[in-house]
């Protein structure tokens, strides 16, 4: 790993594109479940200015320290967005049927309160799916532990070790 976030505390997520594809290529004659966890958007968000020339600037927070925290977070999430685009493009080139599921397991540690959220709940995050074979979108309000069963059910997968214990 050679690329790290500006604070040096987390590797950047772009390394995961090639690693995910390598994992899928390692089993050419079987279906894969590749569970890739990203970390680039995590961390303590610095109160001092860290990114010298940010692609996205932030203003309007209660003080400069909070602006710096949000600016750091937003720019890291912008980099994550680029990673997701690269991963989606790499998966789109494959002949293997693929579903990409993206979700966040928590909101950033930026002092958010329920009143700050459109849902009124700081413990809810959105999920997004993409596929390369035209599977119709199905919106569902799911908990994290229901998501795997929902996605595999869409694919017609109802057997295997992971279903033995559900």
Region locations from a protein language model:
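Solvent-exposed soluble domains appended to multi-pass membrane proteins
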Residues: 1-166
